UniProtKB/Swiss-Prot annotation:
This is Small ribosomal subunit protein uS5. Component of the small ribosomal subunit. Interacts with zinc finger protein ZNF277 (via zinc-finger domains); the interaction is direct; the interaction is extra-ribosomal. Interaction with ZNF277 competes with the binding of RPS2 to protein arginine methyltransferase PRMT3. There is a cross-link at K274 (Glycyl lysine isopeptide (Lys-Gly) (interchain with G-Cter in SUMO1)). Component of the ribosome, a large ribonucleoprotein complex responsible for the synthesis of proteins in the cell. The small ribosomal subunit (SSU) binds messenger RNAs (mRNAs) and translates the encoded message by selecting cognate aminoacyl-transfer RNA (tRNA) molecules. The large subunit (LSU) contains the ribosomal catalytic site termed the peptidyl transferase center (PTC), which catalyzes the formation of peptide bonds, thereby polymerizing the amino acids delivered by tRNAs into a polypeptide chain. It comes from Oryctolagus cuniculus.
């Protein structure tokens, strides 16, 4: 009976999974009871976590002194970091300070190639702008073999490059600041100039600078560009360079009040005005000595 069962449909029979008979698997890897994976599928998959699932959010463990201070709430805003020009080396610091207000947008994804002995190696370059629409903006670019990896890396680099944006008024100081404080210029291949505009004008510019200016929280601005603006990467970098220079100018309202100290003649004028008895000094002339 056992021989009949094995011949009919058992593991060793023609109808069993170990043979290439009718209705069964053909030989090779993965066939039979002791096949590839041993009943656990074709492996656990690649990437983050199990196949088809999402990686669990892990708690942020800072690795720098600045990260520890931010997580322990010793530093509560980015302005305290910018005040002392401390380098930000963890993107989680930006997430911790700005939180859900931070928005990102992919400006462009372009393929780039490198000639090698084996042929052309193609990678993808991603340009990502990030900002909170309230005075903070960043720009990042990353190359990778995969588009998703390039975008993810560009977002991290954009967070690390976030700069504060100084805003001002065009005329009367009524309401909230709405435009750039003064004329600023940025250069990266092409030259971009930002000019203050009256309230209600909007952003008069090309689409790429307009996205960066909106993310920076600027509502009204004139722009002018010179050079080759068709290269999106250089155009975006020049705009970001101009925006980052808004805190580079020491405007008169930031000048420290100069305190002049009086000279002793001015400080003791009343004392010098008092009448004093004049002391006359008689000069006595020494008698001449005759020499022989």
């Amino acid at each position: 009976m056992a021989d009949d069962a094995g011949a009919a449909g058992g593991p060793g029979g023609p109808g069993g999974p170990g043979m290439g008979g009718r209705g069964g698997f053909r030989g090779g890897f993965g066939s039979g009871i002791r096949g590839r994976g041993r009943g656990r599928g074709r492996g656990r998959g690649r990437g983050r976590g199990a196949r088809g699932g999402k990686a669990e959010d892990k708690e942020w463990l800072p690795v720098t002194k600045l990260g520890r201070l931010v997580k322990d709430m010793k530093i509560k805003s980015l302005e305290e970091i910018y005040l002392f020009s401390l380098p930000i080396k963890e993107s989680e610091i930006i997430d911790f300070c700005l939180g859900a207000a931070l928005k990102d947008e992919v400006l462009k994804i372009m393929p780039v190639q490198k000639q090698t002995r084996a042929g052309q190696r193609t990678r993808f370059k991603a340009f990502v702008a990030i900002g909170d629409y309230n005075g903070h903006v960043g720009l990042g670019l990353k190359c990778s073999k995969e588009v998703a990896t390039a975008i993810r890396g560009a977002i991290i680099l954009a967070k690390l490059s976030i700069v504060p944006v100084r805003r001002g008024y065009w005329g009367n100081k009524i309401g909230k600041p709405h435009t750039v404080l003064c004329k600023v210029t940025g250069r990266c291949g092409s030259l971009v100039r930002l000019i203050p505009a009256p309230r209600g004008t909007g952003i008069v510019s090309a689409p790429v600078p307009k996205k960066l200016l909106l993310m920076a929280g600027i509502d009204d601005c004139y722009t002018s560009a010179r050079g080759c603006t068709a290269t999106l990467g250089n155009f975006a970098k020049a705009t970001f360079d101009a925006i980052s220079k808004t805190y580079s100018y020491l405007t008169p309202d930031l000048w420290k009040e100069t305190v002049f100290t009086k000279s002793p003649y001015q400080e003791f004028t009343n004392h010098l005005m008092k009448t004093h008895t004049r002391v006359s000094v008689q000069r006595t002339q020494a008698p001449a000595v005759a020499t022989t």
